[in-house]
């Protein structure tokens, strides 16, 4: 087994040059690394177990691996599969057609797989890095970041499949990552630290849509609506004070009046906030949102 830097001293470089593994580097730090090993399939009769551990230091990772290997593989497998089966049993039965069953179940499983185990409700956009083979060590973000827009759309997917608790969990995550002025970062690490620093107004509007959608479709799972009024109040206030123009649209990141942003921002999210806020602690802002600032043209008309 050997560990090395990708493109320099990794196992592929060894194999392509020597046609067998000849390197045995035991350490590689501060870079994009790859580990390569060789297993004697004859000696193990074709069966082997690989345990992979992570930690801040080598001893922590080693302890994780050792603890796992001491457990029964069959019991761990049964527990893991059982958790997935239990979750799927709670979803809507949309798989009556055998040909489409796997597509539905696989799709919702992909959504659930992208949720963090440490930051519940935090669902990254993708476990991939686009054009990964051409990326260097400095391209850390990729798509394994949280985009508030994609996160809300994932919550809509959960809700459509009947995973109401999962959708509400997403809202709780958004509640904890909202900026003081009411908006959300363009994208962020799971712990809420902003990555790209752009401002996309639709991403300040989408969480309001999620609150309203949950309010209408699963009020008992959402719980007391008053809990969310502060999130809605701040987001709606940000939209009213800064919209409808956006610093960036969702794809090309151009500034101006984006049709997509306009569709989400004043047409849907702001009236939705107007229905949520009155009677939930902010009648003045609720009135402002439903009637416009000074005149309806100040916010709702683009010429």
Locations of regions flagged by a protein language model:
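Short, well-ordered loop/turn and helix-capping segments at boundaries between secondary-structure elements
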Residues: 54-55, 160, 216, 302
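Extracellular structured ligand-interaction cores
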Residues: 36, 47-49, 151, 204, ...
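Extended ligand-binding clefts on enzyme/binding-domain cores
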Residues: 94-103, 109, 200, 259-263, ...
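Aromatic-rich carbohydrate-recognition surfaces in CAZymes
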Residues: 80, 141-243, 262-269
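Acidic/polar, glycine-enriched structural segments that form the non-catalytic walls/loops
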Residues: 1-142, 222
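Hydrophobic side chains in beta-strands
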Residues: 52-54, 209, 298
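Signature tryptophan residues that serve as conserved aromatic anchors
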Residues: 84-87, 147, 251
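Glycine- and aromatic-rich loop/turn segments at beta-sheet edges
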Residues: 117-141, 178-194, 236-258, 270-286
């Amino acid at each position: 087994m050997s560990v090395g830097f990708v493109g320099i001293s990794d196992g592929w470089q060894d194999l392509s040059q020597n046609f067998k593994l000849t390197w045995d580097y035991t350490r590689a730090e501060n870079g994009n690394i790859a580990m390569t090993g060789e297993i004697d399939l004859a000696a193990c009769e074709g069966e082997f177990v690989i345990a992979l551990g992570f930690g801040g230091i080598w001893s922590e990772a080693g302890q994780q691996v050792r603890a796992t290997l001491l457990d029964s593989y069959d019991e761990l497998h049964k527990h893991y599969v059982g958790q997935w089966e239990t979750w799927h049993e709670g979803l809507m039965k949309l798989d009556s057609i055998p040909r489409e069953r796997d597509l539905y179940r696989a799709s919702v499983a992909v959504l659930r797989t992208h949720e963090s185990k440490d930051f519940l409700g935090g669902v990254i956009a993708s476990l991939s890095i686009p054009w990964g083979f051409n990326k260097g060590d400095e391209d850390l973000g990729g798509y394994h970041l949280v985009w508030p827009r994609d996160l809300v759309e994932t919550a809509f997917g959960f809700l459509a499949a009947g995973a109401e608790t999962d959708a509400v969990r997403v809202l709780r995550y958004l509640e904890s990552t909202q900026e003081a002025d009411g908006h959300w970062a363009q994208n962020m690490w799971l712990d809420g630290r902003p990555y790209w620093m752009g401002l996309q107004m639709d991403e300040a509007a989408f969480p309001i849509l999620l609150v309203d959608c949950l309010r209408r479709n699963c009020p008992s799972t959402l719980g007391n609506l008053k809990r969310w009024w502060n999130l809605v109040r701040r987001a709606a206030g940000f939209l009213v004070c800064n919209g409808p123009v956006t610093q960036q649209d969702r794809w090309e990141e151009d500034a101006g009046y984006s049709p997509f942003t306009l569709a989400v921002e004043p047409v849907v999210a702001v009236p939705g906030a107007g229905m949520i806020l009155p009677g939930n602690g902010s009648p003045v802002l609720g009135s402002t949102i439903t009637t416009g600032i000074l005149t309806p043209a100040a916010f709702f008309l683009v010429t």
